[in-house]
Amino acid sequence: MFFRPTEELQRKRVQKMFEIIAEKEGVPFLGWRDVPVKTEILGDLAKSTMPYMAQAFVGRPEGVEKGLPFDRKLYVVRRVFEQTCEESAYVASLSSRTIVYKGMMLVNQLRTFYSDLTDPDYEVAIAIVHSRFSTNTNPSWERAHPNRYIVHNGEINTIKGNADKMLSREETMYSEYLEEDMSKIIPVVNANGSDSAMLDNTLEFLMMNGMPLPLAVMITIPEPWANNRAMDEKRKDFYEYYATMMEPWDGPASIIFSDGDIMGAVLDRN
């Protein structure tokens, strides 16, 4: 799902850029689909800032397995595209397992705005819907929830330190999964994103490097374990071990997460 520029020439340039990048990364490009929408339900601000929405269809490269291995390949394609086009386009989702539909509207307007969501052929095992107001950022289509892997209520009050820590690790990062593609995806965290988006970036990176999403969530948003007498020692040892590798992303915050196969929820220790 792509949010592209409304100006035709710029939109075509962005479109062609993605096609070239996908093919260069070994992912066959199949075509574009304009997403049917009903703009009449939107408010004035949402309508005036609405991007041009389209879906890109790509093929799974030969020799790449379904699921996470394919999504890992798409992750690289998306990061190369994002860094090439900078702020001229936003990729809401590029996955073989999930599609993100979102925007500047109320929850009860979502399925009316996106006609796809009332199509009987659209059947899913998991669906997450979330609505919130922007608190520390200006509202925009791309900052609406859900993100690619999480929806988030609250704030990440340690976000500056979290983002700086992720940046400082990049010089020594190595990935047996991404290998030579590692240089294409850094920086991991988009500094222009919201706190929710930065956490989403981090969870995505951990997952693409072989860490199950629930584990990635547990080490970034740990329980209150240090002086918790009610917690068993084995669980304390777990959190103490991972605390040497990742600082906590502290809220207060509540998170629902999904990769299309599993779904879970967590509260932070505040």
Which residues does each PLM region occupy?
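Conserved short alpha-helical segments that host acidic/polar catalytic motifs at enzyme active sites
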Residues: M1-N270
